[in-house]
């Protein structure tokens, strides 16, 4: 039986046109949902505000607990979700004018083409069955409600432990951001189906592993499909937790999350408290990716760490350079511009407890958030109009990080008495850039290490206990292999 048909058989109704107020009208097609207990009449609004001072007022909105849906820094506008029965109001003398207001019936499900958690389960296992030499699927944890968290591993000789560098893609930290699942599933499908016919894809999968988590928050996704299409958090406790404010690094340290359980950016009772967060942390710690992209929506942005005010990563040439390069590969939905790159605090507002800051600080991953689609399309664009356009466009970004993983940099294996070791440390320092603090890389469990670098001369120091080896390398456009015996 069709999964979605069986789920909604008891209360389906025809698609509806949603009324417009103030300056615009919105049409949303979908399936009727059961009424949320928090939103009995189902009528929320998305308000577009024209801000007087974009950065300062974005900060005020975050600190005021408003649910920020998306923003356009270039036009100084921000979209706010205002729930039915909400007491929040907007003083135009403080925040600027409300230039658009759309009524959104949260009891209308997303377009039928988008995927439920059950459909994702079916799709990932079908892909593994169809391509057993390329694709493996594993459950890397369970949610509060007991759903499996699925990770897809795509590489040649998939059933062997290959010791290859890893690129990590993940989607749907936030439940209402349904287009992100499409991008993640498309990446897995594209790699598997093109391995036999595309020489570049073959090279990628022969030399690297691509790990993909298409749905970090399946409990929240289920709530989007059955109760509330604007639901953002997971479903633990009475109000849920924002999984992407729950990671331990800088948790509750820079006014980038909320301590109120009713807030859409509620960070949880403690750092790393959530099943989904713990599972993601364990997976990342095990696979130790070189790059990561977390797909979110919406606003057409490429974000990189750090996310608290005034903070930058030491490797700005690699991290920021990569973010800017990806942004140039992503045309806007309107076709007249590109995605905007930057840190969250520079473009939007401070964020604490996010996954990209934790990944970089803890495991030296080069991580990004890509905010898909424009403010015109929102969280749940027409599937037929925007799904293919979006996934095809975003391929350029995840393909960029795969290519970059296999280009300028250093990779090697550390051994002692001929055996690989996992407790060595590699420090790579530029011999050209004055004051370079370098990269400190922990060797993986299989004895390998990998660092993305810009071309130049580097000093490499490999240490384990009282044993140290120092080398000098010259990095050009290709990956340099340096195996070290201690």
List each model region and its residues.
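Extreme N-terminal flexible tails
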Residues: 33-108, 424
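A short, solvent-exposed beta-strand micro-motif common in secreted/extracellular proteins
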Residues: 447, 456-466
């Amino acid at each position: 039986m069709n999964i979605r048909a069986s789920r909604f058989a008891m209360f389906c109704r025809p698609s509806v046109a949603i009324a417009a107020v103030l300056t615009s009208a919105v049409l949303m097609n979908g399936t009727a949902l059961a009424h949320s207990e928090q939103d009995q009449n189902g009528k929320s609004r998305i308000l577009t505000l024209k801000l007087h001072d974009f950065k300062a007022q974005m900060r005020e909105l975050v600190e005021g607990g408003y649910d920020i849906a998306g923003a356009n820094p270039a036009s100084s506008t921000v979209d706010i979700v205002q729930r039915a029965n909400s007491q929040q109001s907007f003083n135009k003398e403080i925040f600027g004018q409300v230039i658009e207001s759309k009524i959104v019936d949260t009891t209308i499900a997303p377009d039928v083409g988008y995927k439920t958690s059950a459909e994702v389960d079916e799709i990932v296992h079908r892909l593994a069955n169809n391509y057993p030499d390329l694709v493996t699927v594993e459950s890397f944890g369970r949610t509060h409600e007991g759903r499996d968290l699925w990770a897809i591993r795509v590489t040649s000789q998939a059933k062997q432990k290959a010791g290859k560098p890893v690129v990590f893609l993940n989607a749907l930290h936030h439940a209402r951001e349904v287009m992100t699942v499409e991008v993640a599933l498309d990446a897995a499908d594209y790699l598997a189906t093109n391995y036999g016919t595309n020489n570049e894809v073959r090279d990628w999968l022969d030399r690297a592993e691509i790990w993909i988590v298409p749905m970090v928050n399946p409990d929240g996704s289920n709530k989007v499909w059955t109760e509330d299409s604007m639901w953002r958090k997971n479903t633990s406790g009475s109000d849920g937790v924002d999984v992407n404010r729950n990671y331990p690094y800088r948790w509750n340290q820079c006014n980038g999350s909320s301590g109120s359980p009713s807030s859409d950016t509620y960070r949880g009772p403690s750092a790393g408290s959530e099943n989904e967060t713990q599972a993601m942390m364990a997976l990342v710690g095990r696979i130790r990716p070189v790059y990561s992209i977390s797909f979110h929506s919406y606003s057409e942005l490429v974000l990189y760490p750090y996310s608290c005010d005034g903070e930058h990563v030491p490797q700005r040439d690699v991290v920021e350079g990569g973010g800017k390069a990806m942004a140039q590969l992503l045309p806007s939905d309107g076709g007249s511009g590109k995605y905007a790159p930057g840190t969250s605090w520079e473009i939007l507002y401070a964020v604490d407890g996010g996954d990209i800051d934790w990944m970089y600080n803890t495991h030296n991953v080069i991580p990004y958030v890509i905010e898909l689609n424009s403010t015109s399309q929102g969280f749940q664009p027409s599937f037929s109009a925007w799904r293919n356009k979006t996934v095809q466009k975003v391929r350029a970004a995840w393909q960029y990080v795969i290519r970059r993983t296999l280009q300028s940099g250093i990779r090697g294996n550390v051994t002692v008495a001929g055996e690989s070791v996992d407790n060595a440390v590699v420090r790579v320092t530029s011999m050209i850039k004055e004051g370079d603090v370098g990269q400190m890389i922990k060797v993986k469990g299989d004895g390998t290490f990998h660092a993305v670098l810009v071309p130049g001369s580097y000093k490499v120091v490999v240490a384990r206990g009282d044993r140290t080896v120092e080398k000098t390398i010259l990095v050009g456009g290709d990956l340099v292999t340096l195996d070290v015996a201690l």
